[in-house]
Amino acid sequence: MLYMIGLGLGDAKDITVKGLEVVRRCSRVYLETYTSVLTVGKEVLEEFYERKLILADREEVEQEADNILKDADISDVAFLVVGDPFGATTHSDLILRATKLGIPYRVIHNASIMNAVGCCGLQLYKFGETVSIVFWTDTWRPESFFDKVKKNRQNGMHTLCLLDIKVKEQSLENLIKGRKIYEPPRYMSVNQAAQQLLEIVQNQRIRGEEPAVTEETLCVGLARVGAEDQKIAAGTLQQMSTVDLGGPLHSLIITGGSLHPLEMEMLSLFTIPENSSEAQSIGGL
């Protein structure tokens, strides 16, 4: 059987009891490494799980899935995912492949950023469509996701922005030349995402458009949600462009405009100080 097991968001101990029991009896255990990361390394997980882990990067999962599914019809294989197993379409594809091969599967869920963002006090049922913000390059600066942000705000809905992760990525030159040389990992921060959003706002004004988001739009930055050093900051988009929330992983919420009094009271716990020097490093659980 193929087991898809969510690991939660914090550290090794965030796996469920059910998930841990399954991991310890599986013949092979894969750890997906490209859609998210935990705050602890592979060795810490192996020690707690009492099992050796096989790292599965994007290429392994998307192009060589048969290796993962090998013998899963006669033995138990675990595929571990940070957060919840269905946080990426790749994982659904793995289940479809297993089903076509006659391999049974079972999913063991866990917390993901999609529901854990409620820790900032914004009500989950008031979130609209989630968007992804990717690292811009000199030749690729996508803005199309901003239409979804606009639609959400028109409907009074908050927008969760998932920020880019670059793990085991090749440069264009190495990709063209077929060289297996990979760039250092990069994780987009809240301030980087806010800076790109501010540029989109300016671009829209230059084109004569009325931007759905401005420098004064209320936003919430979150870092390492679920970890002991989790941080949350609430402030304007302009303030988000300079706030320092520390190491990865980060997420950004663009509020829908009209807030419930309880939402406003909760966000007041995380408000960025007016003093810019104090606003550089924000805490708060």
UniProtKB/Swiss-Prot annotation:
What CDD domains does the record tag this protein with?
A: DHP5_DphB
Q: Which reaction does it catalyse?
A: 2-[(3S)-amino-3-carboxypropyl]-L-histidyl-[translation elongation factor 2] + 4 S-adenosyl-L-methionine = diphthine methyl ester-[translation elongation factor 2] + 4 S-adenosyl-L-homocysteine + 3 H(+)
Where S-adenosyl-L-methionine is bound, by residue? Answer: L9, D84, G87, S112, I113, L163, V225, H250
EC number of this enzyme? 2.1.1.314
Endoplasmic reticulum among the record's keywords? no
Which Gene3D superfamilies does the record cross-reference, listed alphabetically? Cobalt-precorrin-4 Transmethylase, Domain 1, Methyltransferase, Cobalt-precorrin-4 Transmethylase, Domain 2
Molecular function per GO: diphthine methyl ester synthase activity
The biological process GO terms on file are: methylation; protein histidyl modification to diphthamide
One Pfam family linked to the record? TP_methylase
Entry superkingdom = Eukaryota
Instruction: Name positions with the PTM Phosphoserine.
Output: S171
Keywords from UniProt, A to Z, are:
Methyltransferase, Phosphoprotein, S-adenosyl-L-methionine, Transferase
**Cellular component aspect of the GO annotation:** cytosol
According to UniProt, this protein's pathway is:
Protein modification; peptidyl-diphthamide biosynthesis
**Transmembrane region positions?**
none
InterPro entries registered for this protein in UniProt? 4pyrrol_Mease (IPR000878), 4pyrrol_Methylase_sf (IPR035996), 4pyrrole_Mease_sub1 (IPR014777), 4pyrrole_Mease_sub2 (IPR014776), Dphthn_synthase (IPR004551)
Q: What family does this belong to?
A: Belongs to the diphthine synthase family.
Q: Which PANTHER family does the record associate with it?
A: DIPHTHINE METHYL ESTER SYNTHASE (PTHR10882:SF0), DIPHTHINE SYNTHASE (PTHR10882)
Please explain the role this protein plays, according to its UniProt record: S-adenosyl-L-methionine-dependent methyltransferase that catalyzes four methylations of the modified target histidine residue in translation elongation factor 2 (EF-2), to form an intermediate called diphthine methyl ester. The four successive methylation reactions represent the second step of diphthamide biosynthesis.
Supply the name of the protein: Diphthine methyl ester synthase
Native source organism of the sequence: Bos taurus (Bovine)
Classification lineage = Eukaryota, Metazoa, Chordata, Craniata, Vertebrata
